[in-house]
Amino acid sequence: SSGLEYALVAYWEQTGEVSPPPMLTADPVEQIVVVSGSCSPVTADQIDAAEVEGFVLFPLDTAGFVDDRRDRVVERAILDVCALVSKGKSVIAHTGRGPDDPRIAETMVALEQQGLTGETARMTTAERIGRGLGHLLRGVLEETGLRRAATTGGDTSYYVAKEMGVTALEAVAPM
């Protein structure tokens, strides 16, 4: 089993029979852009910590991401985030800062106006916001030439990757 494999490797590293693999790291960058579709308390704490470290927070119009204004809202966000990046800022474009963010209720109202409720509304939200964030991220990266980006949220990350044409990921270093 993999548990036995991990235990053996750890033991062999302790006894000096094998050396631990070299730690891979990413080269530092001056700026990064992050799209966040997670409303979890953990993500909210991470956003708060990033703000303390100098990231500019860009709250997104999530209701606009799920209704017929979607294309205009995303294109406007691309322009606004690019303007912040052009000023040398690292940016987190986010759909919420925790489970109590008022945008969650606003988004659900927008979906209810389209006749969507319950699980259908939840899945529609994940897809529309995720795809919108993917479009936003791709647009910002193309316009600015930034070399590093990140995304948060399980469903969000899936749709962002899909929207950006990502077909595979490879872990090369611990996070």
Where are these regions (language model features)?
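Active-site catalytic microenvironments in core metabolic enzymes, especially phosphate/sugar-handling
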Residues: S1-M175
